[in-house]
């Protein structure tokens, strides 16, 4: 059976994703298929967002043509949704199997702090509105192996990004006076994180993840509900996704970058037990794996106990 390398870029607009795609194209001897390039080619406007259905139909078709011709290829788009990543990965694997071709799937996660994405975006010829970057940031799913990847590559365009948010202890100290303004929390944000961490002391990666599991709250804090109505309590919609992305830039000290990705994944899922309640363990053990679910539940129990 022949083997074809398929690479999917994952990153926010302005993260340096397309520049990275060119680098990996040389490394893997692969063709790059970019959603922005297709928009420019077909609609003469790389910023066009009115024909996404047509753009991605063309992109997917070209990926499959490369696979059928046994060519390595790179999918260059933001690809922020884990569900869509998984669905397309299954789709091309099924397609390749009909051609007696095996897919070696790699995910390139371009790790750039959102504030740099916004800054770099302003330097581009084709700029993405800042509110679009903000929306994508709040909906970003950090990639992980349960999606079906053979390998995930963490690509930091600037080496210093790896620990530019400092240590978990520094975040806790800086938020000891952060009033959460929510009836579910009697403690400040820093106090809550410290108390939750005490509940999982000695748990290694789980302890690290617990110490910053709510780090996305300051960014997401709003006194408006989902209808846009002003409320007396503060809401933190999507803080688990923002927090998971932020974890990639904390100093993980003795942990490797891929262990840090695991911690980010724990933060990504730590709210799910609240949403799924008694169905969480059974449903998500099949979806993301038993070990990951058990570690998420450790954070959940610590989170509840620290309210």
Language-model segments: residues:
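Conserved GTP-binding G-domain of TRAFAC-class P-loop NTPases and closely related GTPase folds
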Residues: 6-10, 15, 23, 115-165
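Conserved substrate/cofactor phosphate-moiety recognition/catalytic segment
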Residues: 19-71
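Conserved beta-strand scaffold positions in the cores of enzyme catalytic domains, especially
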Residues: 30-32, 105-107, 151-155
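Glycine-rich phosphate-binding loop used to anchor ATP phosphates in small-molecule kinases
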Residues: 51-105
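Conserved phosphate-donor/acceptor-positioning beta-strand/loop module used by diverse small-molecule
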Residues: 101-117
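Active-site flanking loop/helix segments enriched in acidic
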Residues: 168-197, 218, 222-232
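Divalent metal-dependent catalytic cores for phosphoryl transfer on phosphate-bearing substrates
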Residues: 196-306
């Amino acid at each position: 059976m022949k083997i074809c390398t398929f690479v999917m870029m994952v990153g926010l607009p302005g993260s340096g994703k397309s520049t990275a795609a060119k680098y990996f194209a040389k490394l893997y001897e692969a063709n790059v298929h970019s959603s922005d390039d297709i928009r420019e080619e077909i609609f003469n406007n790389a910023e066009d967002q009115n024909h996404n259905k047509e753009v991605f139909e063309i992109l997917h078709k070209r990926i499959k043509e490369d696979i059928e011709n046994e060519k390595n290829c790179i999918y260059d788009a933001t690809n922020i949704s884990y569900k869509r990543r998984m669905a397309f990965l299954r789709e091309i694997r099924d397609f390749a199997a009909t051609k007696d071709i095996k897919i070696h799937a790699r995910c390139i996660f371009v790790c750039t702090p959102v504030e740099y994405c916004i800054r770099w975006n302003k330097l581009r010829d084709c700029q993405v509105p800042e509110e679009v970057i903000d929306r994508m940031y709040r909906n970003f799913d950090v990639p992980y192996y349960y999606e079906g990847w053979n390998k995930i590559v963490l690509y930091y365009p600037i080496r210093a990004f790896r620990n530019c948010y400092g240590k978990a202890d520094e975040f806790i100290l800086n938020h000891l006076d952060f009033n959460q303004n929510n009836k579910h929390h009697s403690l400040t944000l820093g106090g809550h994180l410290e108390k939750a961490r005490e509940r999982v002391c000695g748990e290694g990666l789980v302890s690290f993840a617990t110490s910053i599991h709510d780090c996305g709250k300051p960014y997401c804090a709003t006194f408006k509900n989902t209808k846009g109505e002003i409320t007396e309590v503060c809401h933190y919609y999507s803080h688990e996704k923002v927090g998971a992305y932020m974890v990639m830039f904390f100093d993980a000290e003795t942990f490797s970058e891929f262990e840090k990705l695991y911690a980010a994944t724990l933060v990504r899922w730590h709210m799910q037990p609240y949403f799924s309640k008694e169905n969480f363990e059974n449903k998500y053990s099949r979806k993301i794996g038993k070990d990951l679910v058990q570690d998420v539940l450790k954070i959940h129990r610590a989170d509840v106990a620290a309210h």
